[in-house]
C-alpha cells in the first residue's frame, strides 16, 4: 500500500457539554504518524459562541457542523468517524445520510442506537436505569416554545466523580472551565424515524468499552453491543468516561489499529 493511501482522515466528535477541545491530546498523536484529523465542534458547543443550546431544537440541527463537513468532502474520500458518549447519536445521523463517506464508525463508550427501535430507545433505557441522585446535582432546564427541549449542565461533582474520576486533575479543571450546557434531545429523537439498515446499519461499527466508566457503566455499554452487534469490540482497562484524557496514547493506538483493519 502506498504511503499516500495509508494516510487516513479521522473525524472526532465530542459528547454532550464538551467540544472539539476534548481531543487535544489525541489529535497530535494521530497527526504525528501522518494522519489528518478534524475535531468537530457541534452546534452551540466548544467555541461556537454564535448560538446557545436553547437555540437548537433538534439533534439534526445540533449535528449540522458534522453533516456539513461530510458534505464538503470529495466524493472519493472516506473518513474514520469517532463519536464519544452522546456523540454516538451524531454519528448515527451522519451514517444515515452519508454511509458511502465513512469507512468505519467508532463508538467510544457512546450511545449506539439500533435500526429496530426509535432513535431515542437507548437513551430511554439509560434514563430509566439512572436515578436522579446519580446525576449529583446536574442541572436540567426545559426550553423551547413548548418546553419540549431539555438542557443539561453537568455539576462539578458529576464531572469529578462520574466522568473524570481516573483522569488527570488538570483535564478535570479544563473541563470545568470549558463546559457548556448541552442536551440529550430525547423528545426530538423519540419522534424521528428509525435509522435504516441501508444507511446507518450498512457502515462497519466498532465499540470501545471503557471498563471503569461510571457515567455509562460497562454493563450498559455491553447491553448496547448485544442490542445491535458490532464488527469489533475493543476494551480499555482502568479507563473512565473520558478515555481521551485518561489514556490518550492507548486510545490513539486503538484508532490506528481500527483504521488498519477497516480501511
UniProtKB/Swiss-Prot annotation:
Gene Ontology MF term list: hydrolase activity, acting on ester bonds; methyl indole-3-acetate esterase activity; methyl jasmonate esterase activity; methyl salicylate esterase activity
Family: Belongs to the AB hydrolase superfamily. Methylesterase family.
Swiss-Prot/TrEMBL induction comment: By pathogen infection.
Activity regulation text: Esterase activity is down-regulated by salicylic acid (SA).
Cross-referenced InterPro entries: AB_hydrolase_1, AB_hydrolase_fold, MES/HNL
GO biological process: defense response to fungus; innate immune response; oxylipin biosynthetic process; salicylic acid metabolic process; systemic acquired resistance
General function of this protein: Methylesterase shown to have carboxylesterase activity, methyl indole-3-acetic acid (MeIAA) esterase activity, methyl salicylate (MeSA) esterase activity and methyl jasmonate (MeJA) esterase activity in vitro. Required to convert methyl salicylate (MeSA) to salicylic acid (SA) as part of the signal transduction pathways that activate systemic acquired resistance in systemic tissue. MeSA is believed to be an inactive form that needs to be demethylated to exert a biological effect.
Residues at the catalytic site: 85, 213, 241
Catalyzed reaction equations: methyl (indol-3-yl)acetate + H2O = (indol-3-yl)acetate + methanol + H(+); methyl (-)-jasmonate + H2O = jasmonate + methanol + H(+); methyl salicylate + H2O = salicylate + methanol + H(+)
Pfam families found in the cross-reference section: Abhydrolase_6
Protein name: Methylesterase 1
Enzyme category, top tier: hydrolase
E.C. code: 3.1.1.-
Extra remark: Expression of MES1 can restore systemic acquired resistance in SAR-deficient tobacco plants.
PROSITE patterns: LIPASE_SER
Pathway in which this enzyme or protein is active: Plant hormone biosynthesis; Lipid metabolism; oxylipin biosynthesis
Alphabetized UniProt keyword annotations: Hydrolase, Immunity, Innate immunity, Plant defense
Keyword Hydrolase among UniProt keywords: yes
